[in-house]
Amino acid sequence: MKKFFAIAVLAGSVVTTAHSSLLNLKSMVEAITHRNSILSFVGYGCYCGLGGRGHPMDEVDWCCHAHDCCYEKLFEQGCRPYVDHYDHRIENGTMIVCTELNETECDKQTCECDKSLTLCLKDHPYRNKYRGYFNVYCQGPTPNCSIYDPYPEEVTCGHGLPATPVST
């Protein structure tokens, strides 16, 4: 019985993950950047992947910091950006459209956060030296998310980088 329960829990988590925002983000990043999102970006610099600390290492790392802040704002609104599924499509291999099929505001905003990250990653040079970076080496003050406020009107969740990266 215990084995059955463990298998049922595992199967349930796999099914849930299969329809999650993280898989939406993965497909979005891979379609636009043409990089394997897990191998290229999880563990890049101080902020790409889980957690983050210190001063971002480069522009790509700033993109991930902005995305962390965007998700933080969603959590404050009661959203669950890691697990909420949203609908999007890629047009002409370069445009990301968060579709009208997104029913909740959380779905819409999560899609916009992920879209902003993806476009930011596309627009900045990838540096192999920050791939697999151990964030124990990340030093300096952690930038406050308030550097992205207010967000530009045309974009939700901090598209791009702050005009002048500010350490607080």
UniProtKB/Swiss-Prot annotation:
SUPFAM superfamilies: Phospholipase A2, PLA2. The active site is at H67, D114. Induction: Strongly up-regulated by lipopolysaccharide (LPS) in brain, heart, liver, colon and testis. It is a peripheral membrane protein. It is found in: Secreted; Cell membrane. Optimum pH is 6.0-7.0. Changing C157S: No effect on lipase activity toward 1-palmitoyl-2-arachidonoyl-phosphatidylethanolamine (2-AA-PE). Residues 1-20 form the signal peptide. Its main location: secreted. It holds the Pfam family Phospholip_A2_1. Residues 139-168 are annotated as: Required for localization on the plasma membrane. Strongly expressed in testis. One of its GO terms (molecular function) is calcium ion binding. One of its GO terms (cellular component) is extracellular region. Disulfide bonds join C46-C138, C48-C64, C63-C120, C69-C145, C70-C113, C79-C106, C98-C111. Its EC number is 3.1.1.4. It catalyses: a 1,2-diacyl-sn-glycero-3-phosphocholine + H2O = a 1-acyl-sn-glycero-3-phosphocholine + a fatty acid + H(+); 1-hexadecanoyl-2-(9Z-octadecenoyl)-sn-glycero-3-phospho-(1'-sn-glycerol) + H2O = 1-hexadecanoyl-sn-glycero-3-phospho-(1'-sn-glycerol) + (9Z)-octadecenoate + H(+); 1-hexadecanoyl-2-(9Z,12Z-octadecadienoyl)-sn-glycero-3-phosphoethanolamine + H2O = 1-hexadecanoyl-sn-glycero-3-phosphoethanolamine + (9Z,12Z)-octadecadienoate + H(+); 1-hexadecanoyl-2-(5Z,8Z,11Z,14Z-eicosatetraenoyl)-sn-glycero-3-phosphoethanolamine + H2O = 1-hexadecanoyl-sn-glycero-3-phosphoethanolamine + (5Z,8Z,11Z,14Z)-eicosatetraenoate + H(+). GO terms for biological process: arachidonate metabolic process; arachidonate secretion; innate immune response; lipid catabolic process; negative regulation of T cell proliferation; phosphatidylcholine acyl-chain remodeling; phosphatidylethanolamine acyl-chain remodeling; phosphatidylglycerol acyl-chain remodeling. InterPro entries: PLipase_A2, PLipase_A2_dom, PLipase_A2_dom_sf, PLipase_A2_His_AS. Coiled coil: none annotated. Glycans are attached at N92, N102, N144. Keywords: Calcium, Cell membrane, Disulfide bond, Glycoprotein, Hydrolase, Immunity, Innate immunity, Lipid degradation, Lipid metabolism, Membrane, Metal-binding, Secreted, Signal. This is Group IIF secretory phospholipase A2. It comes from Mus musculus.
